Amino acid sequence: MSSGADGGGGAAVAARSDKGSPGEDGFVPSALGTREHWDAVYERELQTFREYGDTGEIWFGEESMNRLIRWMQKHKIPLDASVLDIGTGNGVFLVELAKFGFSNITGIDYSPSAIQLSGSIIEKEGLSNIKLKVEDFLNLSTQLSGFHICIDKGTFDAISLNPDNAIEKRKQYVKSLSRVLKVKGFFLITSCNWTKEELLNEFSEGFELLEELPTPKFSFGGRSGNSVAALVFQKM
Protein backbone atom coordinates (compact mmCIF):
# COMPACT_ATOMS: atom_id res chain seq x y z
CA MET A 1 0.00 0.00 0.00
CA SER A 2 1.81 3.08 -1.14
CA SER A 3 0.92 6.18 -3.02
CA GLY A 4 1.90 9.69 -3.96
CA ALA A 5 3.72 11.62 -6.66
CA ASP A 6 7.08 13.32 -6.82
CA GLY A 7 8.16 15.04 -9.99
CA GLY A 8 7.97 12.29 -12.56
CA GLY A 9 6.09 9.25 -11.38
CA GLY A 10 3.28 7.92 -9.25
CA ALA A 11 -0.35 8.79 -8.71
CA ALA A 12 -1.01 11.40 -6.08
CA VAL A 13 -3.08 10.65 -3.00
CA ALA A 14 -5.62 13.41 -2.49
CA ALA A 15 -5.23 15.13 0.84
CA ARG A 16 -7.28 17.93 2.38
CA SER A 17 -10.00 19.03 0.01
CA ASP A 18 -13.02 21.24 -0.26
CA LYS A 19 -14.96 18.31 -1.69
CA GLY A 20 -16.81 15.88 0.54
CA SER A 21 -16.97 16.19 4.30
CA PRO A 22 -13.58 16.40 6.02
CA GLY A 23 -13.09 14.85 9.42
CA GLU A 24 -11.84 16.74 12.45
CA ASP A 25 -8.25 16.45 11.18
CA GLY A 26 -9.16 18.08 7.85
CA PHE A 27 -8.88 14.94 5.71
CA VAL A 28 -11.72 13.82 3.48
CA PRO A 29 -12.22 10.05 3.93
CA SER A 30 -11.46 8.19 0.72
CA ALA A 31 -11.41 4.72 -0.78
CA LEU A 32 -7.65 5.30 -1.10
CA GLY A 33 -7.48 4.57 2.61
CA THR A 34 -9.12 1.14 2.39
CA ARG A 35 -7.71 -2.33 1.94
CA GLU A 36 -10.35 -3.11 -0.68
CA HIS A 37 -9.02 -0.33 -2.89
CA TRP A 38 -5.42 -1.52 -2.74
CA ASP A 39 -6.38 -5.17 -3.18
CA ALA A 40 -8.16 -4.18 -6.41
CA VAL A 41 -5.22 -2.02 -7.55
CA TYR A 42 -2.66 -4.77 -7.08
CA GLU A 43 -4.87 -7.49 -8.51
CA ARG A 44 -5.01 -5.41 -11.72
CA GLU A 45 -1.28 -4.69 -11.64
CA LEU A 46 -0.49 -8.37 -11.03
CA GLN A 47 -2.58 -9.35 -14.05
CA THR A 48 -0.89 -6.65 -16.15
CA PHE A 49 2.54 -7.86 -15.08
CA ARG A 50 1.66 -11.44 -15.98
CA GLU A 51 0.39 -10.41 -19.40
CA TYR A 52 2.84 -7.65 -20.38
CA GLY A 53 5.70 -7.66 -17.86
CA ASP A 54 4.81 -4.11 -16.74
CA THR A 55 5.83 -3.57 -13.11
CA GLY A 56 3.34 -0.73 -12.59
CA GLU A 57 3.76 2.66 -10.91
CA ILE A 58 6.94 3.73 -9.17
CA TRP A 59 5.25 5.56 -6.32
CA PHE A 60 6.65 9.07 -5.80
CA GLY A 61 8.90 8.49 -8.82
CA GLU A 62 12.44 7.28 -9.33
CA GLU A 63 13.90 10.47 -7.86
CA SER A 64 12.23 9.70 -4.53
CA MET A 65 13.82 6.24 -4.44
CA ASN A 66 17.20 7.71 -5.37
CA ARG A 67 16.85 10.41 -2.71
CA LEU A 68 16.40 7.81 0.03
CA ILE A 69 19.25 5.64 -1.22
CA ARG A 70 21.56 8.67 -1.47
CA TRP A 71 20.78 9.48 2.16
CA MET A 72 21.58 5.91 3.21
CA GLN A 73 24.87 6.02 1.32
CA LYS A 74 25.79 9.48 2.64
CA HIS A 75 25.29 8.29 6.20
CA LYS A 76 27.19 5.07 5.51
CA ILE A 77 24.34 2.78 6.44
CA PRO A 78 25.87 -0.73 6.48
CA LEU A 79 24.78 -2.90 3.56
CA ASP A 80 23.69 -5.58 6.03
CA ALA A 81 21.54 -3.18 8.09
CA SER A 82 17.98 -4.47 8.46
CA VAL A 83 15.58 -2.38 6.37
CA LEU A 84 11.76 -2.54 6.42
CA ASP A 85 9.70 -1.10 3.55
CA ILE A 86 6.26 -0.37 5.03
CA GLY A 87 3.56 -0.84 2.39
CA THR A 88 5.96 -2.12 -0.24
CA GLY A 89 3.38 -2.32 -3.06
CA ASN A 90 5.08 -3.69 -6.17
CA GLY A 91 8.42 -3.99 -4.37
CA VAL A 92 10.36 -1.90 -6.89
CA PHE A 93 12.11 0.02 -4.11
CA LEU A 94 13.27 -3.28 -2.61
CA VAL A 95 14.74 -4.22 -5.98
CA GLU A 96 16.66 -0.91 -6.10
CA LEU A 97 17.99 -1.42 -2.58
CA ALA A 98 19.20 -4.90 -3.51
CA LYS A 99 20.88 -3.57 -6.66
CA PHE A 100 22.78 -1.08 -4.49
CA GLY A 101 24.03 -3.95 -2.36
CA PHE A 102 21.67 -3.93 0.62
CA SER A 103 21.27 -7.53 1.72
CA ASN A 104 18.90 -7.56 4.72
CA ILE A 105 15.69 -6.05 3.37
CA THR A 106 12.06 -6.86 4.07
CA GLY A 107 8.89 -5.62 2.40
CA ILE A 108 5.44 -5.85 3.96
CA ASP A 109 1.99 -5.05 2.63
CA TYR A 110 -1.49 -5.91 3.85
CA SER A 111 -2.55 -6.76 0.29
CA PRO A 112 -1.72 -10.37 -0.67
CA SER A 113 -1.85 -9.31 -4.33
CA ALA A 114 0.84 -6.69 -3.69
CA ILE A 115 3.11 -9.30 -2.13
CA GLN A 116 2.40 -11.66 -5.03
CA LEU A 117 3.27 -8.91 -7.51
CA SER A 118 6.44 -7.87 -5.72
CA GLY A 119 7.49 -11.51 -5.43
CA SER A 120 7.02 -11.98 -9.18
CA ILE A 121 9.03 -8.84 -9.97
CA ILE A 122 11.82 -9.83 -7.58
CA GLU A 123 11.95 -13.31 -9.11
CA LYS A 124 12.15 -11.81 -12.61
CA GLU A 125 15.09 -9.68 -11.46
CA GLY A 126 16.85 -12.82 -10.23
CA LEU A 127 17.12 -11.58 -6.63
CA SER A 128 16.95 -13.93 -3.67
CA ASN A 129 17.96 -11.83 -0.66
CA ILE A 130 14.62 -10.03 -0.20
CA LYS A 131 12.03 -11.10 2.36
CA LEU A 132 8.32 -10.46 1.75
CA LYS A 133 5.45 -10.76 4.21
CA VAL A 134 1.71 -10.16 4.10
CA GLU A 135 1.41 -7.92 7.16
CA ASP A 136 -1.01 -5.27 8.35
CA PHE A 137 1.26 -2.66 9.94
CA LEU A 138 -1.54 -1.68 12.30
CA ASN A 139 -1.91 -5.28 13.52
CA LEU A 140 1.57 -6.75 13.41
CA SER A 141 2.64 -10.31 14.05
CA THR A 142 5.26 -10.88 16.74
CA GLN A 143 7.89 -11.73 14.13
CA LEU A 144 8.67 -8.16 13.04
CA SER A 145 11.10 -6.24 15.23
CA GLY A 146 14.62 -4.92 15.49
CA PHE A 147 14.91 -2.99 12.22
CA HIS A 148 17.66 -0.42 11.76
CA ILE A 149 15.67 1.51 9.13
CA CYS A 150 11.95 1.77 8.34
CA ILE A 151 10.78 3.44 5.14
CA ASP A 152 7.33 4.80 4.27
CA LYS A 153 6.46 6.19 0.83
CA GLY A 154 2.74 6.95 1.07
CA THR A 155 1.40 4.34 3.49
CA PHE A 156 0.90 6.85 6.29
CA ASP A 157 -0.82 9.09 3.73
CA ALA A 158 -3.26 6.34 2.80
CA ILE A 159 -3.99 5.45 6.43
CA SER A 160 -4.86 9.11 7.01
CA LEU A 161 -7.68 8.79 4.45
CA ASN A 162 -9.27 5.68 5.97
CA PRO A 163 -13.01 6.27 6.47
CA ASP A 164 -13.00 4.25 9.71
CA ASN A 165 -11.41 6.25 12.55
CA ALA A 166 -8.27 7.40 10.76
CA ILE A 167 -7.02 9.34 13.79
CA GLU A 168 -6.82 6.19 15.93
CA LYS A 169 -5.21 4.31 13.05
CA ARG A 170 -2.49 6.96 12.82
CA LYS A 171 -1.82 6.61 16.53
CA GLN A 172 -1.57 2.83 16.11
CA TYR A 173 0.84 3.36 13.22
CA VAL A 174 3.19 5.31 15.50
CA LYS A 175 2.96 2.55 18.13
CA SER A 176 3.76 -0.11 15.53
CA LEU A 177 6.68 1.93 14.23
CA SER A 178 8.08 2.28 17.73
CA ARG A 179 7.78 -1.47 18.18
CA VAL A 180 9.59 -2.57 15.00
CA LEU A 181 12.34 0.08 14.94
CA LYS A 182 15.49 -0.25 17.05
CA VAL A 183 16.41 2.50 19.49
CA LYS A 184 18.50 5.02 17.51
CA GLY A 185 17.07 3.49 14.32
CA PHE A 186 15.98 5.70 11.41
CA PHE A 187 12.51 6.30 9.99
CA LEU A 188 12.41 7.79 6.47
CA ILE A 189 8.97 9.06 5.44
CA THR A 190 7.84 10.65 2.18
CA SER A 191 4.40 12.27 2.14
CA CYS A 192 2.30 14.38 -0.20
CA ASN A 193 -0.49 14.84 2.37
CA TRP A 194 1.44 16.16 5.34
CA THR A 195 3.70 19.16 5.82
CA LYS A 196 6.96 18.97 7.73
CA GLU A 197 5.37 20.68 10.74
CA GLU A 198 2.41 18.31 10.76
CA LEU A 199 4.63 15.24 10.55
CA LEU A 200 6.71 16.58 13.42
CA ASN A 201 3.53 16.72 15.47
CA GLU A 202 2.38 13.23 14.44
CA PHE A 203 5.72 11.65 15.38
CA SER A 204 6.50 13.83 18.39
CA GLU A 205 6.42 10.97 20.91
CA GLY A 206 9.56 8.88 20.90
CA PHE A 207 11.03 10.27 17.66
CA GLU A 208 13.34 13.16 16.87
CA LEU A 209 13.73 14.92 13.53
CA LEU A 210 17.19 14.25 12.17
CA GLU A 211 17.00 15.76 8.70
CA GLU A 212 14.67 17.20 6.06
CA LEU A 213 15.48 15.88 2.60
CA PRO A 214 15.28 18.21 -0.43
CA THR A 215 12.16 17.77 -2.55
CA PRO A 216 10.76 19.54 -5.65
CA LYS A 217 9.35 23.03 -5.07
CA PHE A 218 6.38 24.70 -6.73
CA SER A 219 5.40 28.32 -7.25
CA PHE A 220 1.81 29.50 -7.72
CA GLY A 221 0.11 32.83 -7.23
CA GLY A 222 3.21 34.42 -5.78
CA ARG A 223 3.65 31.68 -3.21
CA SER A 224 6.12 28.82 -3.19
CA GLY A 225 6.44 25.60 -1.28
CA ASN A 226 7.08 21.87 -1.46
CA SER A 227 4.58 19.44 -2.95
CA VAL A 228 6.19 16.58 -1.02
CA ALA A 229 7.67 16.32 2.47
CA ALA A 230 10.57 13.91 3.03
CA LEU A 231 11.88 13.61 6.57
CA VAL A 232 14.29 11.43 8.51
CA PHE A 233 13.41 10.70 12.13
CA GLN A 234 15.46 8.86 14.72
CA LYS A 235 13.88 6.75 17.44
CA MET A 236 14.85 7.98 20.89
UniProtKB/Swiss-Prot annotation:
Record keyword Phosphoprotein present: yes
Gene Ontology biological process terms in this record: peptidyl-lysine methylation
Residues carrying Phosphoserine: 21
UniProt GO MF annotations: methyltransferase activity; protein-lysine N-methyltransferase activity
Extent of Gly residues compositional bias: 1-11
Subcellular localization, as worded in the UniProt entry: Cytoplasm; Nucleus
Effect of residue 218 to A: No effect on elongation factor 1-alpha
CC per GO annotation: cytoplasm; cytosol; nucleoplasm; nucleus
Main location: cytoplasm
E.C. number(s) listed in UniProt: 2.1.1.-
N-acetylserine: modified positions: 2
Region (Disordered): 1-31
Superkingdom of the organism of origin: Eukaryota
Record keywords: Acetylation, Cytoplasm, Methyltransferase, Nucleus, Phosphoprotein, S-adenosyl-L-methionine, Transferase
InterPro entries: Efm4/METTL10 (IPR026635), Methyltranfer_dom (IPR025714), SAM-dependent_MTases_sf (IPR029063)
Family statement: Belongs to the class I-like SAM-binding methyltransferase superfamily. EFM4 family.
PANTHER family referenced in this protein's UniProt entry, alphabetically: EEF1A LYSINE METHYLTRANSFERASE 2, PROTEIN-LYSINE N-METHYLTRANSFERASE METTL10
Protein name: EEF1A lysine methyltransferase 2
Gene: EEF1AKMT2
